[in-house]
Amino acid sequence: MAKKDYYEVLGLQKGASENDIKRAYKRLASKHHPDKNQGSKDAEEKFKEINEAYEVLGDAEKRAAYDQYGHAAFEQGGGAGGFGGGFGGGGFGGFEDIFSEMFGGGFGGGGRRNHVVRGDDLRYDIEISLEEAVKGCKKDIRISTLAECDTCHGSGAEKGSKVETCSHCHGSGRIRRQQGFFVTEAVCPSCHGSGKKIEKPCKSCHGDGRVQKAKNLSVTIPAGVDTGNQLRLSGEGAAGENGAPAGDLYVVIHVREHDIFERDGSNLYCEVPISFTMAALGGEIEVPTLDGKLKLKIPAETQTGKLFRVRGKGVASPRGGYAGDLICKVVVETPVALNDEQKDLLRKLEESLAGKSKHRPQQESFLDSVKNFFSNLGKH
């Protein structure tokens, strides 16, 4: 089945900005996260599709390659972003690995003599709250991975069984072939790349030297992370073949949407409702922050949409430095469920303001614009 356009997956146009891409990813990843849709295969596939799209569009270089070549730019790379098919997938190999596999490490031949295959890199998606993202936290996770077999200690052979060098590839694990001017390499079909022949394979791991195991890990998430950030846990991926080094584990962060705050980079945004009397006369109101409440002075004659900046109450960068700001947007509330007395008072206020444009600057500005529009329309 043909892959969907990555922009279409995120619901974006091709010219979308970096912030548009990040916002779309956060919204969709939160909506389709497996924790919120347990047991839903459709949600799981959609979540993988969203992550794959963001791995490419969220990276400037990969996005440029995708814009020019489409999916063909990554067809040989083992999956977007280097993940070989998701959580349990293959490594982060690039073009160097591709050419090494094709030409044995270079155009002159000289292929690998010892078959050492590093373990696969793994991916784990974790969802945290905004508070945890801003302040940092520790999370215990459980992953399933290939680990060294306890029975044979990675040899792949039963105790006392002979392990001989493969006679087909002479222990290299690879077969070299001459094709014109080029020397190519392929995995040995006899030993399947191990470089050895086992007389009696280990019954626990069937000769692989590795078995699937569950592993518990404690992950320290630094303060200031955001959705899409990745934490690399070196050596916590799958065990390598034949004693080769293990791969790495990449923990991908997803920050849940907050009931009050919306994050944009290092700044936090929130809406603050105020009464129309406070908007007219001014006053003081309590506003929330992630560190507790603080008082904000509202000047007289404040209009809906006015922004107030509270410095240093945003998010600090994981790399250090100053915290961003909290931006409060004022929303003037219209009173509801009024009794007759209250309605009479408002009518008297309305009558006292009638015909006095200085009391209604926005309305008068709007009416002037309408008059000018129709006046200019009549001249054409």
From Swiss-Prot:
| Residue positions binding Zn(2+) 1 | C149, C152, C202, C205
* Keywords attached to this entry: Chaperone, Cytoplasm, DNA replication, Metal-binding, Repeat, Stress response, Zinc, Zinc-finger
- Summarize the protein's role: Participates actively in the response to hyperosmotic and heat shock by preventing the aggregation of stress-denatured proteins and by disaggregating proteins, also in an autonomous, DnaK-independent fashion. Unfolded proteins bind initially to DnaJ; upon interaction with the DnaJ-bound protein, DnaK hydrolyzes its bound ATP, resulting in the formation of a stable complex. GrpE releases ADP from DnaK; ATP binding to DnaK triggers the release of the substrate protein, thus completing the reaction cycle.
Coiled coil residues, start to end: none
Q: Which SUPFAM superfamilies match?
A: Chaperone J-domain, DnaJ/Hsp40 cysteine-rich domain, HSP40/DnaJ peptide-binding domain
What are the CXXCXGXG motif repeat spans here? Answer: 149-156, 166-173, 188-195, 202-209
What SMART domains does the record point to? DnaJ (SM00271)
Describe, as the record does, how this protein assembles with itself and its partners: Homodimer.
Q: What does this protein's record comment on cofactor binding?
A: Binds 2 Zn(2+) ions per monomer.
- Stated name of the protein: Chaperone protein DnaJ
Q: Which cofactor does it need?
A: Zn(2+)
One Pfam family cited in the UniProt record for this chain: DnaJ
